């Protein structure tokens, strides 16, 4: 059975924290690949102004292009409305019955697991992999695999704020993503 990691998110913008998490889990669990799963509309972010799907996808392609073990999965972008992990993973497990999926989540999402849509059924479809993030403990009543990673306190919301404040984001996200953001005037106030 193939072992594939999945890291979901808005990737608004993608940054070195996403890449670090994906790479550390890839090596720690001896995965074949890690698929980045950009969300259409994450249920926990409804109502927030999110950058266009086209721009987020382009930035994600630029961020992941150098790693042959990283791929982009468009499953959630093909649907309209909120993206529920259960619905997506049900589709993916039917499409790829020979794959054992490892769904990678940060410490903030580990604590939020009890609120996930159809969590009990989702546990039959994936193995959750929790990675530590500063300020969060990996506490949950659900079974998760834990992977220790070096702390790198960067987030997409921090980067959007830094761009609005016209602060440098160098060394926080891939240079090609930074160039794309600046050329397209993303995250300006």
From Swiss-Prot:
Chemical reaction(s) catalysed: nicotinate beta-D-ribonucleotide + ATP + H(+) = deamido-NAD(+) + diphosphate
GO biological process: NAD biosynthetic process
SUPFAM superfamilies: Nucleotidylyl transferase
Signal peptide range: none
Pathway: Cofactor biosynthesis; NAD(+) biosynthesis; deamido-NAD(+) from nicotinate D-ribonucleotide: step 1/1
GO molecular function list: ATP binding; nicotinate-nucleotide adenylyltransferase activity
Keywords: ATP-binding, NAD, Nucleotide-binding, Nucleotidyltransferase, Pyridine nucleotide biosynthesis, Transferase
Protein name per the record: Probable nicotinate-nucleotide adenylyltransferase
Species of the source: Bacillus anthracis (strain CDC 684 / NRRL 3495)
């Amino acid at each position: 059975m193939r072992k594939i990691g999945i890291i979901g998110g808005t990737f608004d913008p993608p940054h070195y924290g996403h890449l670090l998490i994906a790479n550390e889990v890839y090596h720690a669990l001896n995965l074949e690949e890690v698929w980045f799963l950009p969300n259409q509309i994450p249920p926990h972010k409804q109502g927030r102004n999110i950058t266009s799907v086209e721009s987020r996808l382009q930035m994600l392609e630029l961020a992941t292009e150098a790693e042959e073990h990283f791929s982009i999965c468009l499953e959630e972008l093909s649907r309209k409305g909120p993206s529920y992990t259960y619905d997506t993973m049900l589709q993916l497990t039917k499409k790829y019955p020979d794959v054992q999926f490892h769904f990678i989540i940060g410490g903030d999402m580990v604590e939020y697991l009890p609120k996930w849509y159809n969590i009990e059924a989702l546990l039959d479809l994936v193995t959750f992999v929790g990675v530590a993030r500063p300020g969060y403990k990996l506490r949950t009543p659900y079974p998760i695999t834990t992977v220790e990673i070096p702390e790198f306190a960067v987030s997409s919301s921090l980067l959007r704020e830094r761009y609005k404040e016209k602060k440098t984001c160098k060394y926080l996200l891939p240079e090609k993503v930074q160039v794309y953001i600046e050329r397209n005037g993303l995250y300006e106030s």
